[in-house]
Every structure is written in C-alpha cells, then in structure tokens.
Design a protein with these regions (language model features):
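Phosphate/pyrophosphate-binding active-site segments
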Residues: 1-3, 292-390, 496, 506-552
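N-terminal cofactor/phosphate-binding cores enriched in small/glycine residues
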Residues: 2-82, 88
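Active-site diphosphate/adenylate-binding microenvironment
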Residues: 8-13, 26-30, 34-35, 346-430
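A short, small-residue-rich loop immediately preceding and capping a beta-strand
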Residues: 21-24, 45-47, 65-104, 272-280, ...
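Glycine-rich, anion-gripping cofactor-binding loops and their flanking helix/strand elements
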Residues: 82, 215-301, 401-429, 443-447, ...
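Thiamine diphosphate
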Residues: 100, 107-117, 394-552
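Glycine-rich, acidic loop regions that bind phosphate or pyrophosphate groups
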Residues: 101-150, 241-348, 452, 474-475
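Glycine/aspartate-rich loop-and-adjacent alpha/beta segment that forms the canonical ThDP
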Residues: 121, 160, 165-195, 518-552
Length: 552
C-alpha cells in the first residue's frame, strides 16, 4: 500500500534510490501520505517517536553511529520547529540528517488556516540545502531535481538538508504500487588533494622546532590512529587529544586542562607552538582555546572537508580535505626533527598524573570521586555517550579506556538532546552503550525515554547534584544575588520516570554505595537500567577547585 499522491511517491522513491535506510516518524495527518508510503516500503526501516525534538536527536544518534543519512518526518506547523536544536547540532557536527516536513499548500499559508506556519527555508541559517516542493504535475521535473540535489548533498557533505512537501487534501488515498522515478545526477565538486601545496607546507613543518596537533571531536578511525603514530614518533611534535577525539597514544596529552592549568607566562611561551594543526569538531577545553588565542602560533592549519574554523583567530591555512587523506600524503614531505619539545611536556604530563592520583586517594565523596568510580567501571569495547556542561568537563580530567568509543553533542554544546542522542546511538550500535549525564540534562530531555526502541543493554548513570553544577564551577554566577536562576536547585529524582518507562532503577549516595551498585550494573538484563548517584552540591565546586591547586 502506497500513497496515491504522486509527490509523496517521488519523495519515497528518491529516498529509496539514495539509500536512506531509516526514517524516524512523528505522528500527524498532513504527513500521512509519506507515513503510509515509508511504513510500507520493504527496504526502509521506520521508527515511531512522538516528540519531534526527541525524534530528531534520536535520528541524529543513529546517523552519528552509522555515518549514513537518516530521515526524520513530521506534520506541518510548530512540529517542524521542534527539529531545530538537532538540526543545528547536525550542522555543526557534520552529521547527515534529512528533514522531511509536510506542509499546507502555499495558498493556505498566512490566511488563518489551522496548523500553518512559514515553513519554506525555515532553517536557512543552519542547513546545507532547502528543497521547497510544489504539488503540481507540471513541477514534477523541478521537484525531482530538488529532491535529488538535497539527498546527494546530505550523502556527500555530511550535514542536514530540508525537504518541504506541501500536500492538499485528500491525504489518505492509496494505491497498490510505488512508481519508480528517475533523479538526475547533480555534479558536486569533490575534494581535490592536488590543490594542496604539500611541498610548501612540508618546508614550514620541517623548519619548525615546536609543532602541535590538536584533535577535537572525531569518529573512531583506525587508519588515522596509525598515521598519528608516525607523528608521535617525532620529538618535535606534541599531540593534544580531547576526550571526544577517539584517538589514543601514550605520547599524547589526553587531559588538556590537567596539564595547562595555572602555567606561568614563561611556561606558556615555552609551550607555544611554531606550527599548529587542528582537525576534528568543537574543542571542549576553554583553557586550550584561551592559551592559543593569547599565545598564537605563527602558522595555524585547519583540516576539514567542509569548512574552515578560525577558533584561535590566527588561521593561516585552510586545508579542505579529510584529515586521513592529508596526513597520508603529508608523510612524504616531512622529516623528523630532534627536539626536547615533546619530552619536556610529556614529563610535565606524567608529574600531573601522579598528583592527580594522589589527590583522588584522599578525596571526599563528590562529583569528582563519582567520576573516578564510574569511568573505571565502564566495560571494555563499549560506547560512552556523555552529556554537556560539567559532565564532559569532568570526563576530560580522566584517562578513559582506549577500547571505549566516546561521543558528545559538541556541535552546539547544548544539554537539550543528549539523552535522545544516546538512545539513538545505542539503537544503531549493538555494543553496550553507557550514557553519563547530569540531572538537569537528564530531566530536560526526559521525554527521550518515551521511545519503544531502547535496547536492554542501554545504561544511564545520572550524577544528580540537585542543580546546574557548572554554574558553581565557572567564575561569575557566584558573585551575583541571582544564583538560583543559574543553578536552578531542585529535589527531583529519576525513580518514577524509570518505572514509567520500564527501566530498572538503582540509586547511590556514598562512595560505598556507588561501588556496590556499579558491581552488577553492566550485566545482561531484560530491561535498560538507570543508576542515579546523588552527590553533595555544596561541596563539589570546592573539591574541584582544590584539585587544580593541588596538581600545580
């Protein structure tokens, strides 16, 4: 059974031909023709999520793991606007998301008809392409071209696209067969390594005594990992890897803030690189950003397949290619240089690690101690999803097992869809997925649990410090008389939500109970699990601030 409407058939046929394998559908009437068609297509998996914001982040989590476009489908009106947070995240995180919205015909917009808004180009500031279709036989070729271009861009450029599909009534008429349509191939410019002057870059690199490579959000890549081994062998190269980089090396600095906190001006000058190479997504560490803005390298090269990012206001070279392609070609033009740059700072790193371990031995029960316990307990070869705000910042202070793949919504750094993203990732990746989140982030996206596709091996660890802990850590909020509006203190727990959504629920409130509850937490179960850990909100910030003083 398929929709009788030809425009709906064109959209469905295009998605099938462009290998869109998954469509997340939110209920509505105006999108009925597409819902009927997608749900009856034998090569397209359809998933139902009611809340559009949760649906979009759920789809984003699937696309994050599969590295393939995932479509989301909704009805007309404000339903579409609920997609925006996930679209912005996809835009800045280079995740392919195909947004398909049903709409009223143009003659019904802005005349007082129900459930209508101005949907055309509504995401124009955060979308790679917008296809505004017209339901009319004479526009069939135009519609096919726009749909084909949108899907091809989503596939080739890894980002969100929007297809707006207006339907007039009737909406529920069906036919038995789906017509196959042809879609013209749109010629898109491809990445061309021949345009990169490797010889010039090699000369600059080879003459520099201090080279730094800084890696942001990055999908696990075995080939890139091997290439980094070659650069780590050069004693004039210092590699900084964020928690979300999924790159591990014993000669890399993986806890950036731990190293550079409270360095003196003289030490910062010694750390300042001559050449800086950056690749990957957004950088979490504010301290490394501040350092590289205050002590700018002479040469900053940013590598990205799509867009340049001048994070430190000193970009000298945008290298538009994939990092793995750049480093594999660049190897032929570089020569290792003897320098004490790497060894000096690795020694410094090791000294900080010793102080880190010593501090943790005597630490009071707190967010900090909970992170040590939780991160150490995560099983090998699983996937770790981390929410934003203080949670990702605590995680950055620890070395996490190399076999664990780590993800976080750092495109826009919002707390709004972390739970739904983690659920989508857990659905797509059959590895056990562990999601560590703060209380505000969890409750903000608690509707994400209203999803029938959550696997039984999914685990959530909530660090509940009764409010926004980040606002006690960062300078500023504590100096005002409006603290409650920043930290938003509360007495909520996840216990009743867990029962309502069929999760097993556990709780802990001390070092001993955390250890006890973690013992069997990751074992096979029939239901997903939540472990809620309550920490003392009054002491967490002091313990963290004391930590940075102790490791100096």
């Amino acid at each position: 059974m398929y929709p009788k409407k030809e425009l709906a058939q064109i959209v469905i046929s295009a998605c099938s031909q462009f290998k869109i394998e998954t469509v997340v559908i939110s209920p509505g009437s105006r999108n009925a023709p597409l819902t009927i068609g997608f749900s009856n297509h034998n090569k397209i998996e359809t998933l139902s999520v009611v809340d559009e914001r949760c649906a979009a982040f759920f789809a984003l989590g699937i696309a994050q793991q599969t590295q393939k476009p995932v479509a989301i489908l909704c009805t007309s009106g404000s339903a579409l606007l609920n997609y925006y947070p996930a679209i912005a995240e996809a835009f800045y995180s280079n995740i392919p998301l195909v947004v398909i919205s049903a709409d009223r015909p143009k003659h019904l917009i802005d005349i007082g008809d129900g459930q209508t808004i101005r949907q055309e180009n509504v995401f124009e500031n955060h979308i790679l392409f917008s296809a505004n279709l017209i339901e009319n036989e004479k526009y069939k070729t135009r519609n096919s071209q726009l749909i084909g271009e949108a899907l091809q861009i989503a596939v080739s450029q890894n980002g969100p696209v929007h297809i707006n599909v207006p339907f007039d009534e009737p909406l529920y008429e069906t036919v038995e067969e789906l017509t196959t349509f042809s879609f013209p191939h749109i010629s898109l410019s491809s990445l061309d390594n021949s345009n990169i002057d490797y010889e010039k870059l090699g000369n600059i690199w080879n003459s520099a005594e201090k080279k730094m490579i800084l890696v942001g959000v990055n999908y696990p890549d075995a080939e890139l990992h091997q290439l980094m081994d070659l650069y780590a062998a050069d004693t004039s190269v210092l590699i900084f890897t964020e928690t979300t980089s999924n790159l591990h090396h014993d000669k890399a600095i993986d806890s950036i803030d731990q190293l550079i906190f409270s360095l003196t001006d003289a030490e910062f000058k010694k750390l300042k690189p001559d050449v800086l190479i950056t690749f990957g997504g957004m950088i979490v560490s504010k301290r490394i950003k501040r350092f590289l803005r205050d002590y700018q390298p002479k040469h900053h090269w940013d590598i990205d397949a799509r867009k340049a990012t001048n994070t430190f206001f000193c970009l000298s070279e945008f290298i538009q290619t994939k990092p793995v392609d750049f480093f594999s070609h660049f190897n032929q033009f570089i020569t290792p240089l003897q320098s004490d740059y790497q060894s000096k700072w690795l020694t410094f790193r090791d000294e900080r690690r010793v102080k880190h371990a010593a501090y943790l031995k005597n630490i009071k029960y707190s967010d900090f101690s909970v992170f040590e316990q939780a991160l150490a307990s995560i099983p090998d070869n699983c996937q770790l999803q981390i929410s934003n705000s203080s949670i990702i910042r605590y995680a950055q202070l620890f070395s996490i097992k190399n076999s664990v793949n780590i993800f976080c919504n750092r495109g826009t750094s919002g707390i709004d869809g972390s739970t739904s993203t983690a659920i989508g990732a857990a659905f797509a990746n059959k590895k056990q997925t562990v999601f560590i989140t703060g209380d505000l982030s969890f409750f903000y996206d608690s509707n994400g649990l209203w999803n029938s596709n959550i696997p039984a091996n999914f685990r959530i660890i909530i660090v509940n410090n009764s409010g926004g802990g980040i606002f006690k850590i960062i300078p500023g909020p504590g100096t005002t008389n409006a603290t409650k509006y920043f930290t938003t203190p509360h007495c909520l727990t996840a216990e009743h939500l867990s029962k309502m959504h069929q999760f097993e629920y556990q709780k802990a409130y001390s070092t001993e109970t955390v250890a006890k509850e973690l013992e069997g937490f990751f074992e096979t179960s029939k239901k997903p699990k939540i472990l809620e850990i309550f920490t003392p909100s009054a002491e967490n910030d002091l313990i963290l601030k004391t930590y940075f003083k102790q490791i100096q």
